[in-house]
Design a protein with these regions (language model features):
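Core beta-strand-centered patch of the WYL/Sm-like small regulatory domain
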Residues: 2-95
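Polybasic (Lys/Arg-rich)
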Residues: 73-170
Length: 170
């Protein structure tokens, strides 16, 4: 299928998209698949897709997508657990520290995909395998209660996002 979208100048742009699964998240529908000129998985909001044309070419095999080299079928349950927001891109193992007061929220977001490690009366250390970009925004959403411990590159990105956001207010 082809996804009609607008670039920054307002011009139409077209994509060749290899679809693998239709999913629903937070009241919206998304098509999970691969932009033909990229090697990773991404998502398109269905309500923003226009001018669809079915092409007479075979879909790219799942095994050719980054992170899916050993898979013949798309595991939608795993994908949804790792992609708490509908961002495409890589999933990574994240370790973070959280106030115990938000354990229920952690379970709401990551149930079945979270391991609780070191626990104290005030804090708990958690490990999740999750979409990197989505977790950055999740950590920002809960920044008063959460501290990312690893990977170091994500710690840096969250710190920079907080610094950039703070500069809007001071």
């Amino acid at each position: 299928s082809s996804d009609l979208n607008l670039d920054y100048a307002g011009n139409e742009r077209n994509y060749i998209f290899n679809p693998y699964q239709l999913v629903s998240s937070r009241g919206l529908y998304y098509l999970v698949g691969n932009h033909d000129n990229h090697d990773d998985m991404s998502t398109l909001r269905v309500d923003r897709i226009g001018n669809i044309k079915l092409l007479d070419i075979r879909r790219k095999p799942l095994r050719e997508i980054q992170g899916y080299h050993n898979q013949n079928t798309f595991d939608v349950d795993r994908y949804m657990k790792e992609h708490i927001y509908m961002f495409g891109g890589e999933s990574v193992t994240v370790v973070f520290e959280a106030k115990r007061s938000i354990v229920n929220q952690i379970l709401d977001w990551f149930d079945g995909n979270v391991t609780f490690l070191n626990e104290t009366p005030q804090k708990v250390e958690c490990r999740v395998h999750v979409n990197r970009e989505a977790f950055k925004y999740w950590a920002l959403q809960y920044m008063q209660s959460v501290k990312v411990l690893s990977p170091a590159s994500l710690v840096f990105d969250v710190r920079e996002a907080i610094r950039d956001g703070l500069s809007q207010y001071v």
